Amino acid sequence: MKTISAKFEASQRKWILVDAENQVLGRLASRIAMRLRGKHLPAFTPHVDLGDFVVVINADKVQLTGNKWDQKLYYRHSGYMGGVKVQSARKLNAGNPEKLLRLAVWGMLPKNRLGRKLIKKLKVYKGAEHPHEAQQPTRIAL
């Protein structure tokens, strides 16, 4: 018996719509990452992009448990000495709620060429409106 390896050309990728309102950030991000990779499919192949496109709405209404709004910190660096910038989750969500969810999902994807390709299939919007109506995304509850 031979092992079947899925091919990218034979994949049927769908568009999925996810409402992030009152969803816990980490749990939602792990389910989105699973969909992006295609791990929900029986023909999952680790090195092939078989996952769906995911459109997330209401990213500004995502929830964090405990005191993570103030205790969870996001770091970035300008490249200069002493150029480290630190933001709490509350401040990041107030300024750019899409980035909060995108960083959570990015942390759960592989850090290679495939991961960079997968993160491009994630579309995050802070309101209930999105410009992907032409793709007719299927609304699912994760």
From Swiss-Prot:
GO terms for biological process: negative regulation of translation; translation. The keyword Chloroplast does not apply. This is Large ribosomal subunit protein uL13. The gene is rplM. It comes from Syntrophobacter fumaroxidans (strain DSM 10017 / MPOB). Belongs to the universal ribosomal protein uL13 family. Gene3D superfamilies: Ribosomal protein L13 (3.90.1180.10). InterPro entries: Ribosomal_uL13, Ribosomal_uL13_bac-type, Ribosomal_uL13_sf. This protein is one of the early assembly proteins of the 50S ribosomal subunit, although it is not seen to bind rRNA by itself. It is important during the early stages of 50S assembly. Keywords: Ribonucleoprotein, Ribosomal protein. Transmembrane segments: none annotated. It comes from the Bacteria. Part of the 50S ribosomal subunit.
